[in-house]
Structures are given as structure tokens and as C-alpha cells.
Amino acid sequence: MSMLFYTLITAFLIGIQAEPHSESNVPAGHTIPQAHWTKLQHSLDTALRRARSAPAGPIAARVAGQTRNITVDPKLFKKRRLRSPRVLFSTQPPPEAADTQDLDFEVAGAAPVNRTHRSKRSSSHPIFHRGEFSVCDSVSVWVGDKTTATDIKGKEVMVLGEVNINNSVFKQYFFETKCRDPNPVDSGCRGIDSKHWNSYCTTTHTFVKALTMDGKQAAWRFIRIDTACVCVLSRKASRRA
């Protein structure tokens, strides 16, 4: 009887040691495929090992919420499904102006080759020809100081400002487009019949994959950024008696 009891206790202890602790490794509210999370966890383990050997000051800064110069595995950036033409990791600031047509072209699945040629083509063939106007005026810029954002589940997450890849510091940029003015003309949107319609310009959003922090863990998440300026219409009430 004592031998059977000892065997059961031993099996129970082995089972506890062999049980995977996945809940402590996976960020809450995130659904990463297991293969991808394994690679991400490997890079985090590497970063933690380096952090333990670093001075106490930088470690305390990271724990306090700093999201700069976090070491990540370069293999994470080879996943094609994680790429977005509106998200850029670069060691230097990108050009001030960018071609939104190129961004849409790349989203559709075309290979981003010969970008210089497309830029020249766009500059020689403007979007609006003589006599053509935009209903709403928009402005597009590369944003490199984003610290927080809203994820696809409505939760506010911390955005990684910089990452360390192969001992080089890359900054995370987001190409955002928003309305320059909600009312480009006194009546609202340009070219709309104000006698029958109310109108105004508003910024719309989309979700892109970005590197974020959740607690002490880095992970890819869909975050919301500004991507377009559109005209909103509503029919005016009839004045019939």
C-alpha cells in the first residue's frame, strides 16, 4: 500500500513539473500562432539575459515603462504577413513626402520594387489635373513619436519607439493620413450641394501590425492609425409645410 501511495505521489509531482506554463508567456488579449510566439519568446529570453548583465539603471528604466532600444530577433521581420507599407523600421527618418498610391499598390500584394521609378512617375503625373479638386484636403506624414495606441480590441497598448536589431537601433515609424481641415469650404466638403446636403470631412482609421509592449513582453499587435480623410454626408430636412 505504501509503495502504491509513493508511486502516485511521484507521478503527481512529475506531472506538475511537466505542465506547460503558457498562460504566463502569452500576453492577454493576443492571438499569435504558436510557431510565431515560440520565436518571439526566444528573442525575449535573449533580451532578458542581456538585461540581467546590464547595469541596474537601464533595467530599472525599462521596468518603469521605457520602450526604447529593446532587443528583438531579426527573424521576426521576415514574416511577410507582419509587413505593412504604413509601418517602417529605419535607422534614419524617412522622406517627408510619400506616395499614397504606392502604399495602396503594395497593400494589394505587388512587390515593392523600383520605388524610385514610381516616385518619379508620380511627381511627373500629379493625382489632380487642371480643373480637378479634392472633396477634402488631407495631410500625410511619417509619425515617429507614437508611444501609445488603441489595439483591435479597444485596449490601450504601449508602442515600441525603438528596437535593437543586430546591434543597430531602428525606430518604428507610422505613415498616417488625416484631414487638414474638417471644413475646407464654409459649407463643409468641397463641391457638395449645400442646399440639400450637410457635409464635413473626417479622418478614418485602419489597423496595422506594430511592435508593442504589454507589461514586460514585446509582441506584434494590430493598432489603429489614421489613414484617410473622407467626406460625410447627411440629407437636410425638407422644409415642406
Curated annotation (Swiss-Prot):
Keywords: Cleavage on pair of basic residues, Disulfide bond, Endosome, Glycoprotein, Growth factor, Metalloenzyme inhibitor, Metalloprotease inhibitor, Protease inhibitor, Secreted, Signal. Belongs to the NGF-beta family. This is Beta-nerve growth factor. Disulfide bonds join 136-201, 179-229, 189-231. It is found in: Secreted; Endosome lumen. Residues 19-121 form a propeptide. Homodimer. The homodimer interacts with a single NTRK1 chain. The homodimer interacts with a single NGFR chain. The NGF dimer interacts with a single SORCS2 chain (via extracellular domain). The NGF precursor (proNGF) binds to a receptor complex formed by SORT1 and NGFR, which leads to NGF endocytosis. Both mature NGF and the immature NGF precursor (proNGF) interact with SORCS2 and with the heterodimer formed by SORCS2 and NGFR (via extracellular domains). The NGF precursor (proNGF) has much higher affinity for SORCS2 than mature NGF. Residues 1-18 form the signal peptide. GO terms for molecular function: growth factor activity; metalloendopeptidase inhibitor activity; nerve growth factor receptor binding. The keyword Iron-sulfur does not apply. PANTHER family: BETA-NERVE GROWTH FACTOR, NERVE GROWTH FACTOR NGF -RELATED. It comes from Saimiri boliviensis boliviensis (Bolivian squirrel monkey). Glycans are attached at residues 69, 114, 166.
